[in-house]
Amino acid sequence: MAPYPNWLRNSLLTAWALALPALAMVVPAGTQLQIRLKTKIASNTSKPDDPVETIVIAPVTVNGTPAIPAGVTLRGVVTGASEATDPTVRATLALDFRELEIGGQRIRVHTQLTAVENARESVNDKGEIQGILANETLSSRMDSGIDKVAEKYSGFGGLLSAAKKAVFKETEGDISYDAGVEMDLKLTAALTLTGPPPPGPDAALQPVADPRALVDLVNRQPFQSRAQNPPKPSDITTMMFIGSQEQVQGAFADAGWHQASKLGEKSKFETMRAIAEDRGYSEAPVSILYLDGRPPDMVFEKINNTFSKRHHLRIWLRPDQYQGQTVWVCAATHDTGIDFSAKDRIFIHKIDSQIDLERSKVVNDLLLTGKVQSLLMVDRPNVPRNGQNATGDNLTTDARMAVLVFE
């Protein structure tokens, strides 16, 4: 029998391929999504069915395979909102994120909010945001103390009350999130995606010019900063940046990070106000840590609406160069709460011990800006996997350093 002509064979193969179902990937229920608001929402102004738009800010993988890239759009609506009508009533805000736009498709998703990043509010087991009670804040407790003084010394109590009102603003209990606030969700039902995922921000990355030289450079760097008071080892470095100061500052600004104020009397006073009023302070100062005896050259942070929680990092200029470019190293941690040190009589932050999560946070934020040219993860065999910072928090890391080369 004569063989099939090429045109017929190719036509049959094409028809067979078109008849196959598109390659599908199932993202299981329980998978976490990290998102960033593009829409302002508030318990006292938002209404049911108001649209809410966000972007996914961290890639989602399934068994190591890319599924949902960072940068895709996730849309939702407000499903409920109630005001804090007085200091004893909690504001509430409920959201439903239900449509993922990916690869030119709009796909129905089922999600539940699990956390609002660095927020003073909490999220209950139904995914509803619960506001604070204004009468439970430090400012309100100060009012109670002044009232007790006024019971014995009416004139003095009035003087204290007037002084307090001149310094501190009344705490508002309503929930208000600007564009840029970040949230965590979980899928409540499996999500089926067809076809390959669209490229994420990492698709445009270029290989580093001389990886061996970069590995040597990384492993020559000091790996742990030191505090001055008390003089103890502190944060472990987890990132290196290659580029000018302007490039580094521009990338962090585009990623929504703020430069911290210098530690001084004015910033200390503003910190005290932020704690008392239970609000954010986007340029809050950080304690000074030293690397090779030098204080940080740049400090950035990302805060929502409370001083007690924040992403923050310190960056030190190094004497080295790579491919003729400036070299910086960075230590980043996530403050998850605040405590008072009776010994030092100061407020101190408690941190998430898994510092590699903060490294991933920073890397993902910077990749989304489109200003990173190359990324390399470098092993550091001489860096310990476990340690402590100067205030006694545990530190756990895989010891790798993320090296980002800026465009």
Language model features by range: what are they?
Residues 1-16:
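Bacterial N-terminal signal peptides that target proteins for export
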Residues 221-251:
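Terminal, regulation- and interaction-focused segments at domain boundaries
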Residues 25-199, 261, 265, 270, ...:
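Contiguous beta-sheet cores, especially beta-hairpins with glycine/small-residue-rich turns
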Residues 19-24:
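Boundary at the C-terminal end of the N-terminal hydrophobic targeting segment
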Residues 203-230:
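Compositionally biased P/S/T/G-rich terminal and signal peptide-adjacent segments
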